[in-house]
A protein has these predicted regions:
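Short aromatic-glycine-(Arg/Gly/Cys) micro-motifs in beta-strand/loop hairpins
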Residues: 1-60, 91-137, 166-174
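Short, mixed-charge low-complexity intrinsically disordered segments
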Residues: 39-96, 138-142, 148-179
Length: 179
């Protein structure tokens, strides 16, 4: 499993009305912050791909916002104070370990639509109560356990085959501490 890196916008109660509306709409009252790869809720802080990025990013359809070179990424975001520096693994086959390039803490698993929109089935689809309960999500909106995340991924696909947001990739998410 290869780690990828991304820096996303923080989404917290400090976002005022946007946060309040999101909590009201989603019903995720346990959240103290949302950490997700959902591009509508937690967009990347480097939305434009510069020419010098190409040697340092994932060169795959819909994945060019992810970096493979942690040090290069950190140089690009050095001047940004409020940010989530994330290490992620797409479709891990077991619980991954973050590389020692920074002090990363494991936050949990997200499930994002496989093709194109990067919408989280956990936090941006108004829930799938027949598959998982909102109360299963952590204070940052993620599933804690690998086995449960795989089960939710499998059940979303089998119980909602017509729903594009239910065809998901599983993402393990770690956040850098102290950066």
């Amino acid at each position: 499993m290869t780690p990828w890196f991304i820096v996303t916008k923080q989404f917290t109660p400090n976002d005022g009305n946007a946060w309040s509306k999101y909590i009201q709409r989603s019903g995720l009252t346990q959240l103290t912050e949302l950490v997700s790869l959902d591009t509508m809720l937690c967009p990347t802080l480097l939305p434009k791909i510069k020419d010098d990025y190409w040697a340092h990013i994932v060169n795959e359809d819909f994945m060019i916002r992810f970096f493979v070179d942690f040090d290069f990424l950190m140089e690009q975001v050095a001047g940004i104070e409020k940010k989530n520096v994330l290490c992620v693994f797409r479709n891990p086959t077991q619980q991954p370990m973050a590389p020692p390039v920074a002090n990363f803490e494991f936050l949990g698993f997200d499930l994002l639509e496989t093709y194109g929109s990067d919408t989280s089935a956990l936090t941006n689809c108004e829930g799938f109560p027949d598959v998982f309960a909102n109360s299963e999500l952590s204070s940052v909106g993620l599933l804690h356990e690998f086995e449960r995340a795989v089960d939710v991924q499998t059940r979303l696909r089998s119980m909602h085959p017509e729903e594009p947001h239910a065809d998901c990739d599983l993402w393990a998410i770690f956040r850098a501490v102290g950066i």
